[in-house]
Amino acid sequence: MGELQNRAHRRQSSRRIAVCCAPSRQDRRRPNASLCSATTPRRLYGVLLTFAAIAAAIAVSPQSAQAWGPNAQKLILNKSIDTLPPDIRAFFDNGRAQLLEHVNDPLNEKARKPAERHNQFLYLDKYGRFPFTQLPRNYKAAVAKYGKSKLESTGLLPWQVGVYSARLTEALRLGKWEEARLDAAILAAYVAETHDPFNTTENFDGHLTLQNGINERFGTTLIDRFSSFFPMRPNDAAFISDPTDHAFESCLAAHSEIEIILLADRNARLNTKPYDDEYFDRFYNQAAATLIHQLSQAATDVGSYWLTAWTNAGRPQLPH
């Protein structure tokens, strides 16, 4: 799990937020719409839903899951620096360029190293019903109950957050400042992923509900189109007593938002072309509160994990 940091080092030794309606098309860029088939007639819905589920089981791998897009990761990281107390903000602010350069390392590594993909999701709905108490949060206990192969197939995200939280703590304790910034960037990426609802479900791209590609529309396209127009208001960073357990809680909270997003997508698709500007305007208007909340919570948590690592390292004096 340290491969990302090593490769990077070699390269470079509260609740809902009120949002505005979608801005007019004249006020923003309009990237090309995604391609998708037209809405399915009602009489065929049941048949096609069954077919989609069968086809998904054969053709779709969990490794295909799409996380927050690159711009989402950078947006979260930028906002997270503002959550930090003055004692440590300068260290991260002065390293902002380096952090932004490496925050998408896990996403890029996923294409090169298949095993990395397991670190970026946790399919909670593979473990019964909410709050998914069948899954132990202690890694050794989870392995003893389900086996390593089962855990890898359903995702290791919260445990990966715990691993990199410990790595950052150790780097700060030893005064390895460059290594600490690299670990901080990678930790930020994993923490952000715990707030992406579609990282927490086997319906990760909408294939089980005939809403294929919804994860990309929600986590990438809406942000690329509208991020200049919505407010993110993360809270101040706070100490986290158990980094791994907190990551599980973030995944649970994100999972509870899935139905809201699926409904917003279904409503936006009514009487619109797939997927035109009108669709994205309508999808944004209905899903923006959830999107902004998740991004804001992610930024709060990234700052909190950094603060926690520094505190657990003994509050060392950081270079400016």
Q: How should these model regions be labeled?
A:
Residues 46-59:
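Bacterial N-terminal signal peptides
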Residues 61-182, 186, 202-296, 300-320:
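N-terminal, motif-rich segments that launch catalysis or mediate targeting to/interaction with membranes
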Residues 185-193:
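Extended, hydrophobic/aromatic-rich amphipathic alpha-helical segments that build helical scaffolds
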Residues 5, 9-12, 26, 45, ...:
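Low-complexity, intrinsically disordered or signal/transmembrane-proximal segments
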Residues 40-43:
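Short polybasic linear motifs
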Residues 192-206:
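Catalytic Zn2+-binding segment of zinc metalloproteases
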Residues 20-21, 36:
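Cysteine-centered motifs
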